[in-house]
Amino acid sequence: QLARLKGVEEAVDKFYNTGMYRASLEYGFTLFSKPSDFLEGLIHYCHSHGGAKLSLQHSYAMMLGFLLESGAQWERAEHVVKLDCLTFDPKGRLPDGVQARPAKEEKQAFLREFQGKVQRVRAEYFPYDQSVRIFVYDTTDPITREAFCRVLHKQ
């Protein structure tokens, strides 16, 4: 029982307290009867696939793998992991299997609109909800370190 609680604590510290996996966790929690069951399974998955000391990019890959192993729908799992990854990683390296879909026209329009005010911008198409999200890494939340994000819905 103590080892189980230690595993949940480790998962809470790594994945929940950082806030960097918010969308993935919200979706993952729906796949289990209790959030603690999800977190326990996640940390067990991490340990059995190379350990819990993970780089940011590798931790997003682990999250994706665990979501899929837990019965997640591929399109939705890809969506939430990609959203979390691009919200918090200005380098924008996506986990293996997650396809980058740059939205060049929307990025150029955004840069024209905010000419000289922003430089580090990424516009990405998200097929799950048919949206383009523009991430501005020049402007991050001082507490959460979350990039500013504007959502544009495709018609």
List each model region and its residues.
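Acidic/histidine-rich catalytic neighborhood
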Residues: Q1
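Conserved, mostly hydrophobic/aromatic
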Residues: L5
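Radical SAM enzyme core and accessory elements
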Residues: A11-Q155
